[in-house]
Amino acid sequence: MSYLLRKPQSHEVSNGVKLVHEVTTSNSDLTYVEFKVLDLASGSSYTEELKKQEICIVAVTGKITVTDHESTFENIGTRESVFERKPTDSVYISNDRAFEITAVSDARVALCYSPSEKQLPTKLIKAEDNGIEHRGQFSNKRTVHNILPDSDPSANSLLVVEVYTDSGNWSSYPPHKHDQDNLPEESFLEETYYHELDPGQGFVFQRVYTDDRSIDETMTVGNENVVIVPAGYHPVGVPDGYTSYYLNVMAGPTRKWKFYNDPAHEWILER
């Protein structure tokens, strides 16, 4: 199995709380992005104290209450399945604060982390405030829910987005990268992909590769898998009959998403 691919686990961290994924700077090649997925049984709680990190808590499915002990957001979350294809609620919390998540119903929660030293206000990112985009043409169509885009000044370094790609389409395509700190041409952003498939027995293909091929990994990615993108191009292909969802987390030295297309495939945009 590729070192960039993580499969789900089910490790109980406390009563009613299971850890599904944990990507950290110590167990991956990432420096800026960390990521967790938790399953919370109804009535259970998870607490954590942030140090020099900010977090975006995404209510992937189910309903939760989130508090940093100054602000409390009750009964947030909008869907039982990501394939209802409607935006969800999220909460941004800045560094050096503690938070608690309580499950109002059975819930899956994504915790998206990046470095931060400047405190910013805690914020509820309402589902209706997610910017929705329809990108691409031909067989490269996808729908994007912008949870925490670079146009939103609510965070110091964190970017968070959900993407839906229909049967037979490609996403993050033509292949693009953002691994050079060379603005205005390109920004350096690490990235993680948390994938779900409908139906759940499906899979997608994702390739991560650099110009010099020091990274060149092509992966068969199953439901609830995570792909780590420390650098390089990272397209996703969705087979016929299945729908793809993924949650992206990005962060780097500058909070700007400026990508560079693979010149070998950029002609696709000129059709």
From Swiss-Prot:
**This protein's record includes keyword Isomerase:** yes
What protein name applies here? 5-deoxy-glucuronate isomerase
Q: Which domain of life is it from?
A: Bacteria
Q: Which family does it belong to?
A: Belongs to the isomerase IolB family.
**What InterPro entries does the annotation carry?**
Deoxy-glucuronate_isom_IolB, IolB_Bacilli, KduI/IolB_isomerase, RmlC-like_jellyroll, RmlC_Cupin_sf
Query: What EC number(s) does the entry state?
Result: 5.3.1.30
Q: Which UniProt keywords apply?
A: Isomerase
Q: What does the record give as the function of this protein?
A: Involved in the isomerization of 5-deoxy-glucuronate (5DG) to 5-dehydro-2-deoxy-D-gluconate (DKG or 2-deoxy-5-keto-D-gluconate).
Please name the GO terms that the record assigns under molecular function: 5-deoxy-D-glucuronate isomerase activity; glucuronate isomerase activity
The family database entries (HAMAP family) matched by this protein are listed as: IolB
Report the catalytic activity: 5-deoxy-D-glucuronate = 5-dehydro-2-deoxy-D-gluconate
Q: In which pathway does it act?
A: Polyol metabolism; myo-inositol degradation into acetyl-CoA; acetyl-CoA from myo-inositol: step 4/7
**Gene3D superfamilies linked to this entry:** Jelly Rolls
SUPFAM superfamilies, alphabetically? RmlC-like cupins
Q: Name one Pfam family in it.
A: KduI
Q: Does the keyword Ribosomal protein apply?
A: no
Q: Top enzyme class of this protein?
A: isomerase
